[in-house]
């Protein structure tokens, strides 16, 4: 499933957000 990060961050391949 798709996970959207907030504040313009993007989802890292391993999970979590990169800002």
Curated annotation (Swiss-Prot):
Disulfide bonds join 5-17, 9-19. One of its GO terms (cellular component) is extracellular region. Expressed by the venom gland. One of its GO terms (molecular function) is toxin activity. Its main location: secreted. It is found in: Secreted. The keyword Chaperone does not apply. This is U1-poneritoxin-Ae1f. Belongs to the poneritoxin-Ae1 family. Keywords: Amidation, Disulfide bond, Secreted, Toxin. The modification Cysteine amide is found at residue 19.
